[in-house]
Amino acid sequence: MKVGVLALQGAFREHQKVLAACGAESVQVRKPEQLEDISALVIPGGESTTIGKLLLEFNLFEPLVKLGQGGLPVFGTCAGMILLAREIAGSGQPRLGLMDISVERNAFGRQVESFEADLDIPVLGEEPFRAVFIRAPYIIEAGGGVEVLARFGEKIVMARQGRCLAAAFHPELTGDLRIHRYFLEKCVRAGQNCKG
């Protein structure tokens, strides 16, 4: 199994380190041909508008939509979650639309640059997950096929739909491998019919 990590912006190297610690091989993706041999894709954080433009510029946008619609497991963190969304509040920016979610960008206020919080994520066990939020989005609406995995207060900050996983925070910056392991075990290895 080889996991592609979109390497246009953001903490892609950190994602690769976590994947390696989970025993998964990874490859940086910057060109369409690099999508050919991957079993899954991680879309890191960064600036979602910029990443969307770069996906178009590097001819990655359409191949990613087709692969995602065809069942490629995709894990998006922060800006990656925004790109996975069907709808982005107040924005017509490019998005992959692979999850039936609507998101709000910079949802915790632009003045709140970053913060950390303990999240209860039952699918990961009883121990809270220390999440790092950096100008984070959140999910304002989730369709019927979307499983909400975590909230911060009332705000949805982690969700799964089929083989797609989205987190508003940055698990790659924590040293906690559980979310990446969950993605590999439940979305990648378990196959399309996995329900959790």
From Swiss-Prot:
- GO MF, one example: pyridoxal 5'-phosphate synthase (glutamine hydrolysing) activity
Where L-glutamine binds, per the record, is at G46, E47, S48, R105, I134, R135
Q: Does the keyword Chaperone apply?
A: no
Give the EC number(s) listed in the UniProt record. 4.3.3.6, 3.5.1.2
Which UniProt keyword terms apply here? Glutamine amidotransferase, Hydrolase, Lyase, Pyridoxal phosphate
Catalysed reaction equations from the record: aldehydo-D-ribose 5-phosphate + D-glyceraldehyde 3-phosphate + L-glutamine = pyridoxal 5'-phosphate + L-glutamate + phosphate + 3 H2O + H(+); L-glutamine + H2O = L-glutamate + NH4(+)
Task: Look up the record and report any one GO term of the cellular component aspect.
Answer: cytosol
Q: What biological-process terms (Gene Ontology) are attached?
A: glutamine catabolic process; pyridoxal phosphate biosynthetic process; pyridoxine metabolic process
Q: In which pathway does it act?
A: Cofactor biosynthesis; pyridoxal 5'-phosphate biosynthesis
**Which residues does the entry assign to the active site, renumbered to this chain?**
C78 (nucleophile), H170 (charge relay system), E172 (charge relay system)
The UniProt function text for this chain reads: Catalyzes the hydrolysis of glutamine to glutamate and ammonia as part of the biosynthesis of pyridoxal 5'-phosphate. The resulting ammonia molecule is channeled to the active site of PdxS.
Q: PANTHER family from the xrefs? A: PYRIDOXAL 5'-PHOSPHATE SYNTHASE SUBUNIT SNO, PYRIDOXAL 5'-PHOSPHATE SYNTHASE SUBUNIT SNO1-RELATED
UniProt-listed NCBIfam families = PLP_synth_Pdx2 (TIGR03800)
Quaternary structure and partners: In the presence of PdxS, forms a dodecamer of heterodimers. Only shows activity in the heterodimer.
- Report the sequence similarity comment from the record: Belongs to the glutaminase PdxT/SNO family.
The name this protein carries in UniProt is: Pyridoxal 5'-phosphate synthase subunit PdxT
Query: What is the species of this protein?
Result: Pelotomaculum thermopropionicum (strain DSM 13744 / JCM 10971 / SI)
